[in-house]
Every structure is written in C-alpha cells, then in structure tokens.
A protein has these predicted regions:
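A short, aromatic-enriched beta-strand patch in the conserved N-lobe beta-sheet
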Residues: 29-30
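Protein kinase catalytic-loop region centered on the HRD/HxD motif
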Residues: 73-83
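Conserved N-lobe beta3->alphaC-helix segment of eukaryotic protein kinase catalytic domains
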Residues: 1-19
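Conserved short submotifs of the Hanks-type protein kinase catalytic core
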Residues: 34-48, 52
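Activation segment signature within eukaryotic-like protein kinase domains
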Residues: 67-68
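Terminal C-lobe "cap" of eukaryotic-type protein kinase domains
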Residues: 212-237
Length: 258
C-alpha cells in the first residue's frame, strides 16, 4: 500500500473483475491488509506463452493458429465489454497446463474502459508490441485502444511463429540506440520472416492486414474472424462463444476499492 497503488491498479481491479471468460484469468477477489493490497486470481499452471514459445524456438503454423484463435476470441470479448487491454503480449498470456494448452489473458493494469475512463492518450505498453499510433501519440491526443490491441495480437502471432520480435534485429543488441531503431521499424512496418520458415500465403495475407500503420486501414476483429487462415481447423462454436458469455450482475462499480 502507499505510493505504488496508482490509478493503474484501480483500473486493473475495476476492469478485470468484469471480464469473466474461459480465456481470461479469473479475477476472484481483492482485499487490503496492513502493508499490501492483494489481488487473488485464478491459477494458470502452464506458465506464460513467452517461455512456451522460447522453449520450442517458435511454433508450427498450425499450433500458432490454435493459440491465435483463442487470443482473438478473448480480445473480442474484452472489446465487447468496453475495455481496451493496451498491453497484450506473450508475457501476459498464461497457459492452463492441459496437454493441448488453453490460453488465459492476464494483467489489465494498462486497460481502459470506453465509458467509465478517459480515452487512451498515453504511450503505455511494452515497446516491442506498441502500435504506430501509440508511439506517435502526443499530449492532448487520443487513439483507439481497441484498434491498437489488434496490432499487438499481430505481433504476438509473429513471435509465436518465429520466436523473436518482428521489429528487432540481432545486430541491435549492442547498439545503444536499439530501442529507437526498433521504433523506427515499427513506424515503417519493416518486418520479414526468416528464410528457414515456410509461411503460407494465407498467413502472410492476414499479418499484412493486421500490421498496418494506419489504424483506419487495419483489419478489424470481425474481419479476422472471417479470414480463411483464421477459420482453418476452427473448433465448432468458437465464433459464437462470446454470444453466450454472461456479464457479471454486479455491473461496473466504481466505489473506492483501494
């Protein structure tokens, strides 16, 4: 407790507890003791997606699609609930520990609700996943956090396949300007796949439509849900899953929980 309890912690509590979904880590309760504010969440036994991908040196296209299908369903639900996550990444995506793992999104500390919180206008998130409009935002300007979430999903898909970030380069490691170089590549959407990987034309088409600098021209989630690559081997009922999700009866409560 104290100065570390910021507006981000409050947003995390208010937004996360509304998101009850199979692909989102369940928010169970929050309580305060003498020195700490404690958030109790569902346990995900399989660790996070970053470690999972790194251990395998990247995933086969079919396995990456399995995870990406779940990611998009989770993100679509979050957006339906009026929330932009603003920090979607492998490190914030947990696994349930089953033989064919299911993903669980977590960490809503940078999230914003479109009705109850101001429009996104700050450069928050993890640099490697930032959308161009987030990088370019200036004081007094805003951007659509839901649209920038889609960019982050595209970066996640690339990392799942390759095992490294799309806008980083091996030669940057010893360069003191490596962060700035990466940011410039993001703004130019300058990425490619290693020659060792054989990426299907459908996958390349989808990524080319997600990783678009102009947010107005970026593919939408409904369009992703209809894309041929996304729909391949899609389990029955997945597209309709979010129609059956029940919104918590408590609604969005903004009482002082800190």
């Amino acid at each position: 407790r104290g100065e570390k309890i910021t507006k981000y912690v409050e947003r995390e509590i208010l937004n996360h507890r509304q998101l009850v979904h199979p692909h989102i880590v369940r928010f169970k309760e929050v309580f305060v003791c003498q020195n700490f504010l404690c958030i109790v969440m569902e346990y995900a036994a399989g660790g996070d997606m970053f470690d999972y991908v790194v251990r395998r040196g990247g995933l086969r296209e079919s396995e990456a699609r399995w995870f990406f299908q779940q990611l998009i369903i989770a993100t679509e639900f979050i957006h339906r609930m009026g929330v932009a996550n603003r920090d979607i990444k492998l490190e914030n995506t947990l696994l349930d520990g089953s033989p064919k793992p299911l993903i669980k999104l977590c960490d809503f500390g940078y999230s914003k609700h479109e009705k109850f919180q101001s429009a996104p206008g700050s450069r928050v998130g993890t640099p490697a996943y930032l959308a161009p409009e987030v990088i370019l935002t200036t004081t007094g300007n805003t951007y659509n956090g839901k649209v920038s979430d889609i960019w982050s999903c595209g970066v996640m898909l690339y990392v799942m396949l390759v095992g490294s970030y799309p806008f980083e380069r091996a030669e940057d490691k010893k360069d003191p300007q490596r962060l700035q170089r990466m940011i410039q590549r993001i703004l130019r959407v300058e990425y490619s796949f290693p020659e060792r990987l054989h990426i299907s034309a459908e996958l390349q088409d989808l990524l080319d439509k997600i990783l678009v600098a102009d947010p107005e021209k970026r593919i939408t989630i409904p369009e992703i849900l209809e894309h041929p690559w996304y729909n391949k081997d899609l389990p029955p009922g997945v597209k309709e899953m979010n129609d059956t999700m029940v919104i918590p009866s408590s609604g969005y409560q903004t009482e002082d929980c800190l």
